[in-house]
Amino acid sequence: MNRAAIAAGKPSGSISTGKPRRKTRAEVSEEMKHEIREAFDLFDADRSGRIDFHELKVAMRALGFDVKKEEIQRIMNEYDRDQLGEITFQDFEEVMIEKISNRDPTEEILKAFRLFDDDATGRISLKNLRRVAKELSENISDEELLAMIQEFDRDGDGEIDEEDFIAILRSTSAFS
């Protein structure tokens, strides 16, 4: 256990997020572990097996976590046991698995919604879907896009609102 963990009365490696701690999932998918490794390796420029404050911030951002300087500093203080200003891959993996396990699924869904709703109307329209399809280099006809909207448009207004979008994604195993 490190000093910060002992002082806080918690096991080494747990991160204070200000939220009640959820039960950590015993497993993170192998694909996710691979992504964690890739993010670490990408920013471990000197291949030392360690990353510093700035590399940690960018690696976490690459994994979808836009964290403030204060949180990065807390992580560094907790995991930089030898006071070199760096953390190891094992520490990074532990931090990321905990953060991934503690993600708020609704917040993740709303982030995805905002990627579609680029005009900030609170609704996903045919225009929004057309733009996303184009960005993804998908050649999808307006008829197919409209069929997608109609399939999930619960109030029948021709657009998908946040409530519709949340219901769609909650029905998948990724967010259940």
UniProtKB/Swiss-Prot annotation:
Any Pfam family: EF-hand_7
InterPro entries registered for this protein in UniProt: CALM/Myosin/TropC-like (IPR050230), EF-hand-dom_pair (IPR011992), EF_Hand_1_Ca_BS (IPR018247), EF_hand_dom (IPR002048)
CDD domains cross-referenced by the UniProt entry: EFh
Region (Disordered): 1-27
Domain EF-hand: 31-66, 67-102, 104-139, 140-175
Binding sites annotated in the UniProt record for Ca(2+) 2: 153, 155, 157, 159, 164
Keyword field: Calcium, Cell cycle, Cell division, Cytoplasm, Cytoskeleton, Metal-binding, Mitosis, Repeat
One example of a Gene Ontology biological process annotation: cell division
Residues given in the record as Ca(2+) 1 binding sites: 44, 46, 48, 50, 55
Gene3D superfamilies reported for this sequence: EF-hand (1.10.238.10)
GO molecular function: calcium ion binding
Alphabetical list of PANTHER family matching this protein: CENTRIN 3 (PTHR23048:SF48), MYOSIN LIGHT CHAIN 1, 3 (PTHR23048)
Family: Belongs to the centrin family.
Comment field (misc): Binds two moles of calcium per mole of protein.
Quaternary structure annotation from Swiss-Prot or TrEMBL: Monomer.
Function: Plays a fundamental role in microtubule-organizing center structure and function.
Name of this chain's protein: Caltractin
